[in-house]
Amino acid sequence: MSKIGLFFGTQTGNTEELAQAIQAAFGGSDIVELFDVAEVDIEALRDFDQLIIGCPTWNVGELQSDWEALYDDLDDVDFSGKTIAYFGAGDQVGYADNFQDAMGVLEEKITSLGGKTVGQWPTAGYDHSESKAERDGKFVGLAIDEDNQPELTAERIQAWVAQLKPAFGL
């Protein structure tokens, strides 16, 4: 079984904690290997056919700084044949007009480079007005709001991972 590479960017540590929880839900580091994009060469994305991309939305709809620094370098990675799931951290109350935008920006870019998106997540249960991560009434990946709905995070991660396992052949 090939490992899943989980690449995340984090400003305050929240997205790293979410990445660790996702890794644990999959069964640990034998299945999911974690990479902080601040500390790894973007070339490492090439080593995995199955990826999970994690990014918080920062400020007003912006990419987290490490993902922003790597954004143009993504053009040098061929994502054809790669299965990719996304998760994002955001604040649906304070930033209802751009909730999870960073996740949507990364998904759009990587899809344009050949990546196949899996793990779409329902928008029901969230209170936001607009999101670049919304496609056909669903988020492109798991939307986490630790600011306003922390009590739902563990349950959402478990349900999302259960949805992803068949898509990743587990």
Curated annotation (Swiss-Prot):
Pfam families documented for this protein: Flavodoxin_1
Inducing or repressing factors: By iron stress.
Protein name per the record: Flavodoxin
Keywords: Electron transport, Flavoprotein, FMN, Stress response, Transport
Functional description taken from the UniProt entry: Low-potential electron donor to a number of redox enzymes.
Chain ranges of the Flavodoxin-like domain: 4-165
GO MF: electron transfer activity; FMN binding
Family affiliation: Belongs to the flavodoxin family.
Cofactor: FMN
